[in-house]
Structure formats: C-alpha cells, structure tokens
Amino acid sequence: MAFDKKLLEIVACPVCKGKLEYDKANQQLICKADRLAYAINEGIPVLLENKATPWNEEA
C-alpha cells in the first residue's frame, strides 16, 4: 500500500508538533526540527517517539 501524501496535511511530529516531510526513497516521514525519521509501514506512518530513528540530512 502506498503512502497517501494527503496525510501530510494532518499529521505532525509527535515530539514538537511540527511539520513532517515525506522521504519517498526511504519510506519515512522526517522532522527536520527534531532530526527524527518515522518509518512508514505498508502505507501507515508509525508516529511513535520511541520508534523514531535519528535523521541525518547528509545520509
């Protein structure tokens, strides 16, 4: 199942409540403010702070 980009209008980072960006190549949502990446599993974003991974812009 593909991620529906319309979700970006309503989802927010669970840590800072900021905007998330879609990383299609890695199938994750990125919070640049907190430098965290949230996985997307079967089209569903896993927006749990304890499941987030550190995000590095250069990676």
Curated annotation (Swiss-Prot):
This is UPF0434 protein Shew_1640. It comes from the Bacteria. Belongs to the UPF0434 family. One of its GO terms (cellular component) is cytosol. Pfam families: Trm112p (PF03966). HAMAP family: UPF0434. InterPro entries: Trm112-like (IPR005651). It comes from Shewanella loihica (strain ATCC BAA-1088 / PV-4).
